[in-house]
Amino acid sequence: MNNLKYSTQTISKKDIISVSKVLKSELLTQGPVTIKFENKIKNLAGSKYALAVNSGSSALLLACKALSLKPGDLFWTVPNSFVATANCGILCGLKIDFVDIDNDTWNISIEKLENKLKIAKKKGKLPKLIIAVHLGGLPVNPLKLKKLSKKYKFKIIEDASHSFGGKYYLRKVGCSK
């Protein structure tokens, strides 16, 4: 029987020494290493800003809070992601609904999203936010998502926890550009 690993990591001796050095320093979370790390992440992600946090869950919550949405506003995401993707909106007082996934990529189905948006527009119940997950290293088509965002006036959070550093053609995943 073959065992399939969900994920693997490579941690070198240099990594261990670097982490140990920070752990022994006076400034664990707000020191020069954190600033250097944030600058590297900013460059890697192709974003204007970067903020180091303890987890992807915290990053999603901060992103959601930064949008200044109102309690009761509607947001949509996928049903097959880690619970933090849904929880971040709920913790901000938003109401959740789900969009079905693409059977080939397991990401949000752009086609099903567009159909759901058309129906929601007729009912006057459009979402203020879509949280798209780039699941398992397979990115959502950001160009189509952005086009729908402009047409239906919703904000986008890209959860790139599974695809960090990835690209969709030449566009870096997760920067909502």
Show the residue positions of the predicted features.
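Phosphate-binding glycine-rich loop
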Residues: 27-74, 88-90, 98-100, 122
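A short beta-strand submotif of the Rossmann-like class I SAM-dependent methyltransferase core
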Residues: 52, 77, 129-132
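Structural detector of well-ordered beta-strand residues that form the stable sheet scaffold
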Residues: 76, 97, 156-157
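Structured binding elements
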Residues: 93
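Active-site phosphate-binding strand-loop segment of PLP-dependent enzymes
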Residues: 104-177
